[in-house]
């Protein structure tokens, strides 16, 4: 038997519809319902009791359902039913429900990583695929995080999220969860899920997203679980999930109907409830605590400051207008691609210079705005642009940290800074200048989460357009945009109308003059054949095994070659094989990684970095400045020989 999201009640229950209205019409209706139920063997006294109960609840709409089961009648609801006696916005559903054990067998390929489980939609739609994983998750959690618990559910609005929401709700109820808080229409950005978990003191939450990967019937879907701190589940849990997927035998599901996710309110099913919530409210409340919204509003309503935000038809479309327009006063036409769509409008919701082409053309066009930004599928990534100026993600996190005094949340100072290993060393120099603890971690936000929970990190970032702070335990696209607007506003706080604006480019160049510039670029080769990509990595590992300090690579002298490993200073866990590094004596670096965030094939990422202190060279194009290192990287790796690729899919 395969689990079906459409199953709303056990098959041995017989439905019959009754009216909740009073008066003569109600009496006639009740007589008809009694006759109908009698045909199913329900006693007249049971009918009378049930219909009396229905009438006493002062139904505000039709649609109550009486389920006849072995001569007993109990209340359920096939359609949404509002009941005044239960309080405004409360939707009363069955007083109880049955839990069904659905037999199942293990399904291959459910290995769960840092970003959860990501596959093609069709795979998730296959019988029991998602249900197996959800049940395996519940079987992996401590009892106190399941029985009677409160969990958050949200996603980026991509195709299959609505169906998946119903599956998750029913299995949650079947496993004894007490309450699900779900964003309206099943929508909530990844950082908002983290914020809601923390604000509502939930035991955890589900994020339905494949992040920046394309959406639609032929494309990607994903799911992950975040813990009570709001951060992605640690490997101790994800490893258990995978282990349980290999031995699963049953799925526990509740016989409840699909929940209407379009309207705010509480749906009660006995001691289990589903509350449909505004996915923006808790998140916006948090942002108002972090930033000076009056300062931000002053800039965004200024006649000589123009702002553009590309929501890429992704989840931040649900947040952009309430935050930027309604709360901060930006013109409504500041937002474009602002309606979340299941297929992201046919686009690739990855905020970089390639996939956010529409924004890039605006920001590099004639009469360009002063500030442009974009966010990705689930709202955790960001891209920042000035007028004809691009801020690399590596520079972005460094510049935010260096200008933290523009953000009230940091008024007591920064606790520490952290970056992922492939991210440039720009943040390192800020940490040194400010005398702050600094951490270099593997790629994956969970490593930052451990540092944050231990009070050791305030600001962190990844070169993959992820920036954030300890206000939540996920990277946060809108937070990064507001951080940058805060910096621009703070730099212009004493500016009089008509005076020259301190621009994004001015802020970047001022930073480089003080700290030097880390030229940085990333080459992505997407959906390479895994066999060739793995052979390339083995080839590189053979090279580093034989390498020694002083080896020459063109004009560069090797300082260190290794496969990055990390021992977590908080929990002592060790992560190995996190990226192959060639570090040269002048601080330049070449790094190779295989990315695991796609749903098919392998993505090879090559990172190149060179530090430059000479201000006369800071305006060089990054590709020109880095060309010698890029040539070395391609030659040493033999990428074309192993993969057949002659050019990257994306250059950042």
UniProtKB/Swiss-Prot annotation:
Sites bearing Phosphoserine, chain numbering: 211
Under catalytic activity, the entry for this protein gives: alpha-D-glucose 1-phosphate = alpha-D-glucose 6-phosphate; O-phospho-L-seryl-[protein] + alpha-D-glucose 1-phosphate = alpha-D-glucose 1,6-bisphosphate + L-seryl-[protein]; alpha-D-glucose 1,6-bisphosphate + L-seryl-[protein] = O-phospho-L-seryl-[protein] + alpha-D-glucose 6-phosphate
A Gene Ontology annotation in the biological process aspect, one of them, is: starch biosynthetic process
Q: How is its activity regulated?
A: Inhibited by the Calvin cycle intermediates fructose-1,6-bisphosphate and ribulose-1,5-bisphosphate.
Outcome of gene disruption: Suppressed starch accumulation observed in plants lacking also PRAF, but no complementation of the slow growth phenotype associated with low sucrose levels. The double mutant missing both PRAF and PPGM1 displays a disturbed photosynthetic electron transport.
Q: Per the record, GO CC terms? A: chloroplast stroma; cytosol; stromule
- Record GO terms (molecular function): magnesium ion binding; phosphoglucomutase activity
Q: What does this protein do?
A: Catalyzes the reversible isomerization of alpha-D-glucose 1-phosphate to alpha-D-glucose 6-phosphate. The mechanism proceeds via the intermediate compound alpha-D-glucose 1,6-bisphosphate. This enzyme participates in both the breakdown and synthesis of glucose. Required for sucrose production and accumulation necessary during plant development. Promotes gravitropic responses, negative in shoots but positive in roots, by facilitating starch granules (statoliths) formation.
Q: What is this protein called?
A: Phosphoglucomutase 1, chloroplastic
Which organism is this protein's natural source?
Marchantia polymorpha
Q: What is the lineage of its organism?
A: Eukaryota, Viridiplantae, Streptophyta, Embryophyta, Marchantiophyta
- As recorded in Swiss-Prot or TrEMBL, the protein's gene is named PGM1
């Amino acid at each position: 038997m395969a689990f079906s999201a459409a199953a709303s009640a056990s098959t041995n229950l017989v439905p019959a519809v009754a009216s909740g209205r009073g008066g003569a019409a109600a009496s006639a209706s009740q007589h008809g319902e009694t006759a109908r139920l009698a045909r199913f063997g329900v006693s007249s006294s049971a009918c009378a009791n049930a219909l009396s109960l229905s009438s006493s609840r002062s139904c505000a709409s039709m649609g109550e359902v009486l389920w006849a089961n072995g001569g007993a009648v109990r209340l359920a609801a096939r359609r949404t039913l509002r009941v005044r006696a239960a309080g405004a916005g409360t939707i009363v559903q069955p007083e109880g429900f049955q839990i069904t054990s659905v037999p199942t067998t293990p399904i291959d390929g459910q290995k769960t990583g840092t970003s959860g489980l990501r596959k093609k939609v069709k795979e998730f739609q296959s019988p029991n695929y998602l249900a197996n994983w959800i049940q395996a998750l519940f079987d992996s959690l401590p009892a106190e995080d399941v029985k009677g618990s409160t969990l958050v559910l949200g996603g980026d609005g991509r195709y299959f999220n609505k169906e998946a929401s119903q599956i998750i709700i029913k299995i949650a109820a079947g496993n004894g969860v007490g309450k699900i808080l779900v964003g309206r229409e099943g929508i909530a950005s990844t950082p908002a899920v983290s914020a809601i978990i923390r604000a509502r003191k939930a035991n955890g939450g589900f994020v339905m997203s494949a992040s920046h990967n394309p959406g639609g019937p032929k494309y990607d879907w994903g799911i992950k679980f975040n813990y009570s701190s709001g951060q992605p589940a640690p490997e101790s849990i994800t490893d258990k999930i995978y282990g349980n997927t290999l031995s699963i035998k049953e799925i526990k599901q509740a016989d409840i109907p699909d929940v209407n996710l379009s309207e705010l309110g509480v749906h009660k099913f006995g001691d289990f409830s589903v509350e449909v919530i505004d996915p923006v409210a808790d998140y916006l409340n948090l942002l108002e605590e972090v930033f000076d919204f009056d300062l931000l509003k002053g800039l965004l309503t200024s006649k000589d400051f123009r702002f553009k935000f590309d929501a890429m038809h992704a989840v931040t479309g649900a947040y952009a207008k309430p935050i930027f327009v309604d709360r901060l006063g930006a013109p409504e036409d500041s937002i474009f691609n602002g309606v979340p769509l299941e297929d992201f409008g046919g686009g690739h919701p990855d905020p970089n210079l390639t996939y956010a082409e529409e924004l890039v053309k605006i920001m590099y066009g004639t009469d360009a705005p002063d500030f442009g930004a974009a966010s990705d599928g689930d709202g955790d990534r960001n891209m920042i642009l000035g007028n004809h100026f691009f801020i690399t993600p590596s520079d972005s996190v460094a510049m935010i940290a260096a200008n933290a005094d523009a953000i009230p949340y940091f008024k007591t100072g920064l606790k520490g800074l952290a970056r992922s290993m492939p991210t440039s060393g720009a943040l390192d120099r800020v940490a040194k200048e400010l005398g702050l603890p600094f951490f270099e971690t593997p790629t994956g936000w969970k490593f930052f989460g451990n540092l944050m929970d231990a009070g050791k990190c305030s600001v962190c970032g990844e070169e993959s357009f992820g920036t954030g702070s300890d206000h939540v335990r996920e990277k946060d696209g809108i937070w990064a945009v507001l951080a940058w607007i805060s910096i621009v506003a703070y730099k212009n706080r004493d500016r009089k109308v008509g005076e020259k604006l301190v621009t994004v480019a001015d802020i970047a160049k001022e930073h480089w003059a003080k700290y030097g510039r880390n030229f940085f670029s990333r080459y992505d080769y997407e959906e390479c054949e895994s066999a060739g990509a793995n052979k390339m990595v083995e080839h590189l590992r053979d090279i580093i095994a034989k390498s020694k300090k002083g080896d020459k690579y063109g004009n560069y002298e090797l300082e260190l070659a290794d496969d990055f490993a990390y021992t977590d200073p908080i929990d002592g866990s060790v992560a190995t094989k996190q990226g192959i590094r060639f570090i040269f004596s002048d601080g330049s670096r070449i790094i190779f990684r295989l990315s695991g965030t796609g749903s098919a094939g392998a993505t090879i990422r090559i990172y190149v970095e060179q530090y430059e202190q000479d201000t006369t060279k800071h305006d060089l194009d990054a590709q020109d400045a880095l060309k010698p290192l890029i040539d070395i990287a391609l030659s040493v790796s033999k990428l074309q020989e192993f993969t057949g690729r002659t050019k990257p899919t994306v250059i950042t």
